[in-house]
UniProtKB/Swiss-Prot annotation:
SUPFAM superfamilies, A to Z: Ribosomal protein S19
Native organism taxonomy: Bacteria, Pseudomonadati, Pseudomonadota, Alphaproteobacteria, Hyphomicrobiales
Species in which this protein is naturally found: Chelativorans sp. (strain BNC1)
Name used for this protein in its record: Small ribosomal subunit protein uS19
Record flagged with keyword GTP-binding: no
NCBIfam families (UniProt xref): rpsS_bact
């Protein structure tokens, strides 16, 4: 179920403040965040966020196509190594 339209997109307050400060200063530094649940807004385009995936901060450069999605969608939390190979195939 999606979020109600009348509520608007969710963004943590501190993240919005950090993004505004970064825009004003004009420096290209990574904004570290643990807020995977925050929605990407149009004013975030061009900024780089360090989104925490449980182990480290993954750098996510925001583009126009990402607007409306959540930050956590671009920092996977699980690593897929593939299914185990058949033991008989390994021997040959």
């Amino acid at each position: 179920m999606s979020r109600s339209v009348w509520k608007g997109p969710f963004v943590d307050g501190y993240l919005l403040k950090k993004a505004d400060k970064s825009r004003e200063s004009g420096r290209k530094e990574v904004i570290k965040t643990w807020s995977r649940r925050s929605t990407i807004l149009p004013q975030f385009v061009g900024l780089t966020f360090g989104v925490y995936n449980g182990q480290k901060h993954i750098p996510v450069s925001v583009s126009e196509e990402m607007v409306g999605h959540k930050l956590g969608e671009f920092a996977p939390t699980r690593t897929y190594y593939g299914h185990g190979a058949d033991k008989k195939a390994k021997r040959k």
